[in-house]
Amino acid sequence: MLLGCCHLGYKMSRIEPTRFVLFRHSSTFRVHMSVLQVLTFPDDRLRTVAKPVEKVTPEIQKIVDDMIETMYDEEGIGLAATQVDIHQRIVVIDISESRNEPMVLINPEILEKRGEDGIEEGCLSVPGARALVPRAAEVTVKALDRDGHEFTLEADDLLAICIQHELDHLQGKLFVDYLSPLKRKRIQDKLAKIKRFNEKQR
């Protein structure tokens, strides 16, 4: 399971779904959701600092729903809007074993960090790469939910790490930025090689 990861000022025309799937994580809605294209390192768009969501509208909720479906489709446990070329402060996470308990954080803000922790992280935007990243063991987070209601969350263990990972994305930061320049270059070269191979297979 990858720690997946993961904008406003976006343009709807830049959201290019690869296919449509049935909305499955809520019995309340019966609409179709799009699986979005995930950007991969070293795409410069991943370095964009996301802007706050001014108001939670149906359009924002559609983005949230598409992000959740994309996260499940990619088998990640988290996704930031930056990763799908939407530059707003939106994050979705699901660390549950059942894979049907998505958490939505709009305009998330870490209020407090406590302790030290770290695991070997991966990322949907850096496929095939993993590295140990230092993180706070516990965090207190304030955010809005899918309906625009504010809440505060106390998180520890994997959830705390995932939140920090995804919020890094909103600042244009990737987990590879914690690595040495040499390791970062090796990962970039590996991804470029994979991309060239895939293009030849088309």
Curated annotation (Swiss-Prot):
Fe cation binds at C123, H165, H169. It catalyses: N-terminal N-formyl-L-methionyl-[peptide] + H2O = N-terminal L-methionyl-[peptide] + formate. This is Peptide deformylase 2. GO terms for molecular function: metal ion binding; peptide deformylase activity. PANTHER family: PEPTIDE DEFORMYLASE. It comes from the Bacteria. It is an enzyme of class 3 (hydrolase). Belongs to the polypeptide deformylase family. SUPFAM superfamilies: Peptide deformylase (SSF56420). Its EC number is 3.5.1.88. The gene is def2. Keywords: Hydrolase, Iron, Metal-binding, Protein biosynthesis. Its cofactor is Fe(2+). The active site is at E166. InterPro entries: Peptide_deformylase, Peptide_deformylase_sf. It holds the Pfam family Pep_deformylase. Binds 1 Fe(2+) ion. NCBIfam families: pept_deformyl, PRK00150.1-3. The keyword Protein biosynthesis applies. Removes the formyl group from the N-terminal Met of newly synthesized proteins. Requires at least a dipeptide for an efficient rate of reaction. N-terminal L-methionine is a prerequisite for activity but the enzyme has broad specificity at other positions. The lineage of its organism: Bacteria, Pseudomonadati, Pseudomonadota, Gammaproteobacteria, Vibrionales. GO terms for biological process: co-translational protein modification; translation.
